[in-house]
């Protein structure tokens, strides 16, 4: 009887191991493959539109000169900023716990800083109002809960998004020029390009992946890569002027 009971327990444990998602942490020698590269813009960079803050003198006086929109930012070499690069396929049923530390969005000079950011699903998003005027933060998701909250000067608040989405537009109902984007992922393999257009997706398990690059105005581009253990693949994305 004890032998039958032990066999049943072993079978049950095996079934649980098979059916449960793989709980993995990024990092470690067995998952040290990487995909890195640069995102380029090809063609004439669109002229940024002027931003008028005349409706709120508190905002206007924080800037020495006129401001322009941040829609397409590329340097003279064509390195493209504010592109979200991420793994879209290939991770299977692997699951990853969200980080405990929040991602911070500042409202400073009546602008969202950063303009484009990425967070994990269910990771805390801390919204900080550094301005001496009130804001009203209003994300407009397609797959997540929509919310619309006022934030007085000098205050902080926390929110989160439960589902993957690339990317959620965010506006301020008080200041119409304030626009930003938040990309949400259930895994840690993503990056947002800085001024040099570079990205680095590190600590990937070996495998074949679809890598996508998303830009708020230029759309989405994708390619497939296969990487082995401890291997680094160099790739690049090129967006062309519309």
Regions of interest found by a model, annotated:
Residues 1-4:
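N-terminal secretory signal peptides that target proteins for export/translocation
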Residues 9-19:
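Bacterial N-terminal signal peptides
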Residues 24-242:
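Extracytoplasmic copper-binding redox domains, predominantly the cupredoxin/blue-copper superfamily
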